[in-house]
Amino acid sequence: MPKVEIYSKMFCPYCVRAKRLLTEKGVSFQEYDITLGGPQRAEMIQRAHGSTTVPQIFIDDAHIGGSDDLAALERAGKLDPLLAG
C-alpha cells in the first residue's frame, strides 16, 4: 500500500471528511497537525505548491489536493487504483 500523508488542523470539517474516507477504505495514513503552524506548515505549503488550505493530501509523495479533490477521485473511480499502489 502506498504512503499516504495528510496535513490537517483541529476542528477542520474538511480534514475530518478526508480522514473518514481514507479510514473507511482501510488506509493507514501519517497525519501532520499544523494547527499551531510551525515548520510542518511551511513544509506543507512548499510540497503543495503554495496551497495554504487544509487538508493537503499526498499519496506516495504525489500531491492529491484537498478533501474535495480526494472525493472527486473517489467518485470517478480513480482513488482505489492510487491506493493500490
Task: Locate the predicted segments by residue.
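Local sequence-structure signature of Cys/Sec-based thiol-disulfide redox active-site neighborhoods
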Residues: 1-32
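Anionic group-transfer/hydrolysis microenvironments
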Residues: 7, 35, 62
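Residues that form or flank phosphate/diphosphate-binding pockets in enzymes
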Residues: 16, 39, 65
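Chalcogenol-based redox active-site neighborhoods
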Residues: 25, 52, 80
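Thioredoxin-like thiol-disulfide oxidoreductase module
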Residues: 34-52, 83-85
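Structural micro-motif
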Residues: 49-58, 68
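Non-catalytic, surface beta->alpha helical segment in thiol-disulfide oxidoreductase systems
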Residues: 59-85
